[in-house]
Amino acid sequence: MILHAQAKHGKPGLPWLVFLHGFSGDCHEWQEVGEAFADYSRLYVDLPGHGGSATISVDGFDDVTGLLCKTLVSYNILNFWLVGYSLGGRVAMMAACQEPAGLCGVVVEGGHPGLQNAEQRAERQRSDRQWAQRFRTEPLTAVFADWYQQPVFASLNDDQRRELVALRSNNNGATLAAMLEATSLAVQPDLRANLSARTFAFYYLCGERDSKFRALAAELAADCHVIPRAGHNAHRENPAGVIASLAQILRF
């Protein structure tokens, strides 16, 4: 079994750019940014429970990273960058810490490296279970209307929230709930030590208005790019800024 993805081919000899979306997104999420890099081959992946991979269920991060590796093999991707937002960034970090063959580097936008104590994990598990129950049982428009009121999305205006609620409500609530629980921060290991000891290139992107993740970025041994005029979802709020940062990263 492999994950559903859309592949766009560029010039031979350059590494692939493998894009991983955030929770409730899909393979289209990164395409405005990715298509600015037409010289590179691009793979836009649907994570389990989402888009064309909605029927794929997983029990945890090991299943997700295993499916991702099988997907790369199926496309004969031998050299690649992982580029992930939020959940996709966490998947990218988890996969990269396993040091797969052919990995050139990782670019993470607003991805959490992991909680650091049992109390934080217990609280996050309670919260994610409550959200998962709502995703399973309530209309998605109502759930996402509340989802985008969370502090991490404070930089969004009302129009941006309405647009996101409409877009995300096309998902399957049950499969979102399953993926939310399987990849909760409550079950993700703290990756800080692994990332500090890494052998791959590691870059971090965060919006200038995303105070939570700017603080987290400061804890990581990563080259951090702050995206102007953007909050947590920087590639949606300022795609040109993310394109500029990614172009700078890929030039090295």
Swiss-Prot record:
Residue ranges the record marks as coiled coil: none
GO biological process: menaquinone biosynthetic process
Keywords of this entry: Lyase, Menaquinone biosynthesis
Enzyme superclass (EC): lyase
Reactions catalysed according to its record: 5-enolpyruvoyl-6-hydroxy-2-succinyl-cyclohex-3-ene-1-carboxylate = (1R,6R)-6-hydroxy-2-succinyl-cyclohexa-2,4-diene-1-carboxylate + pyruvate
Metabolic or biological pathway: Quinol/quinone metabolism; 1,4-dihydroxy-2-naphthoate biosynthesis; 1,4-dihydroxy-2-naphthoate from chorismate: step 3/7; Quinol/quinone metabolism; menaquinone biosynthesis
InterPro entries from the UniProt entry: AB_hydrolase_1, AB_hydrolase_fold, SHCHC_synthase_MenH
Lyase as UniProt keyword: yes
EC number(s) from the headed UniProt entry: 4.2.99.20
Entry's Gene Ontology molecular function annotations: 2-succinyl-6-hydroxy-2,4-cyclohexadiene-1-carboxylate synthase activity
Domain of life of the source: Bacteria
PANTHER family attached to this UniProt entry: 2-SUCCINYL-5-ENOLPYRUVYL-6-HYDROXY-3-CYCLOHEXENE-1-CARBOXYLATE SYNTHASE, PROTEIN PHYLLO, CHLOROPLASTIC
Similarity section: Belongs to the AB hydrolase superfamily. MenH family.
Subunit structure and binding partners: Monomer.
Protein's job: Catalyzes a proton abstraction reaction that results in 2,5-elimination of pyruvate from 2-succinyl-5-enolpyruvyl-6-hydroxy-3-cyclohexene-1-carboxylate (SEPHCHC) and the formation of 2-succinyl-6-hydroxy-2,4-cyclohexadiene-1-carboxylate (SHCHC).
Stated name of the protein: 2-succinyl-6-hydroxy-2,4-cyclohexadiene-1-carboxylate synthase
